[in-house]
Amino acid sequence: MSEYKQCIVTREDLKLSKGKFAVQVAHAAISASEWASKNDLEKWKEGGQKKIVLKVPTLNDLYELKEKARREGLPTALIQDAGLTEIPPGTVTVLGIGPAKEELIDKVTRNLKLV
């Protein structure tokens, strides 16, 4: 039986407060899950909603990762900040990938480091 997970990928080049960081990760988790298939979403929930938070150096790395995930057919969500507090409006902060089968997500994220 396959395991399911979700990955949230953050940008190292953005220096966000802990609170802003947490909110952006939460936005990505919810938004990406809304794009998952009903079956994958149910299996993920049944398995405890496993989430992993990873990092990439730059915005370009985030865009490249989104494209890799798209080619694998994975649900994704790029999060843009409203710009009301710490960073300019429209700044892309994080990428949510999944939930989906762990082995599919690992094909895209296996070389990334944990936050």
Swiss-Prot record:
Any Gene Ontology CC annotation: cytosol
Pfam family, any one: PTH2
GO molecular function: peptidyl-tRNA hydrolase activity
Keyword match Calcium: no
One GO term (biological process): translation
Main location: cytoplasm
Gene3D superfamilies, per the entry: Bit1
SUPFAM superfamilies: Peptidyl-tRNA hydrolase II (SSF102462)
Keywords: Cytoplasm, Hydrolase
Top-level EC class as recorded in UniProt: hydrolase
Tree of life domain: Archaea
EC number: 3.1.1.29
Reaction catalyzed: an N-acyl-L-alpha-aminoacyl-tRNA + H2O = an N-acyl-L-amino acid + a tRNA + H(+)
InterPro entries in the cross-refs: Pep_tRNA_hydro_II_dom_sf (IPR023476), Pept_tRNA_hydro_arch (IPR034759), PTH2 (IPR002833)
Subcellular compartments: Cytoplasm
UniProt record similarity statement: Belongs to the PTH2 family.
Protein's job: The natural substrate for this enzyme may be peptidyl-tRNAs which drop off the ribosome during protein synthesis.
Xref: PANTHER family: PEPTIDYL-TRNA HYDROLASE 2, PEPTIDYL-TRNA HYDROLASE 2, MITOCHONDRIAL
Protein name: Peptidyl-tRNA hydrolase
Gene: pth
